[in-house]
Amino acid sequence: MSEQKLKIGITQGDPNGIGWEVILKALADPRMTELFTPVIYGSPKAAAYYRNTLRETEPVQFAPAASAAEARRGKIALVAAGEVEQPEPGRATAEAGRAAVEALRAAVRDLKAGELDAVVTGPFDKETVQSDEFSYTGHTEYFGAELEGEPMMIMCSDRLRVGLVTKHIPVSEIARSISKEKIVRDLATLRRSLVEDFGVVEPRIAVMALNPHAGDGGLVGREEEETIRPAIVEAFGQGILAFGPFAADGLFAGGGYTRYDGILAMYHDQGLAPFKTLSPDGVNFTAGLAAVRTSPDHGVAFDIAGKDQADPQSMRNAIYAAIDIVRHRRARAEWTANPLQRAEREKSNRDVSVKDLPQTDKE
């Protein structure tokens, strides 16, 4: 990238949901364009429609662009993609699903071309986006198919980072989808992300159990003894500071999670329910990929769409997180490419034990 400011792509999501509202509210502050160059992918007609529904938000002015390559510093670029004739707030329609996918594909096209530094995705409706050409159960799976790497869904905030072993699958399939090998791989991915994406020096990871009371020694399920604990032992042998398995209720209710830099949950709701309770304005980050993708941690919220009631803070945080992660990756790449700088760092840390290292990200 030749420009100093990062170019961050933002997709409209479902034009009948709250995507446009939170985008417009988040970008209304002129300081945002001082921080980065926004490139919005979506329907100009939907943008104009929702701009007129916001009573107390400063109107956002767009600069039309054919792609992110035409985006300019100090301007909010709008790449026309996923056009709709007339938004229908609160309605789940095939037209809105198509528009969400078209905007997403345009952003990923520019991301893969190197014209964007990261992408922030607006929420779409998982049912209406389905078609013969798009059969993914979520953004995470789509980005995993389009970009290099094995994606991991990490929910993150200033106080908490939760990774998932399984994502968008039925509860009935969770137990058979968990294996020792997968948990070890996911622990490695989570550790690498905590180091490279969040700047944690020597991350400690809590691993959640699958069954109530962590299986009670096998009385309430054998997964802890036969799968999860052996995975933790193997990962620890590889230098990953993984601990557990911990019963979910005890880990969160007692505040034990604060002693760890990351948490690995076995399934979607096990991780997201406590995360959203503790961090209502958190961010969804897709780790394990060559490129950076984040999103707000809420859905389309059809019930309040078009009513000027949506809170933009999670969208703001998703933008901030994308910027921070890109900067962390570049800083680490620069450091690891400089042998003298790396040698000095290693020398200064030579006599430091694990217990002396920072246990949380202090930034």
Task: Name each model feature, range by range.
Residues 1-139, 181-266, 270-284, 289-300, ...:
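Contiguous, glycine/small-aliphatic-enriched amphipathic segments in soluble metabolic enzymes
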Residues 142-157:
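FAD-binding core/adjacent interface of flavoenzyme oxidoreductases
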Residues 155-185:
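Ligand-binding beta-strand-loop-alpha-helix segment within the catalytic cores
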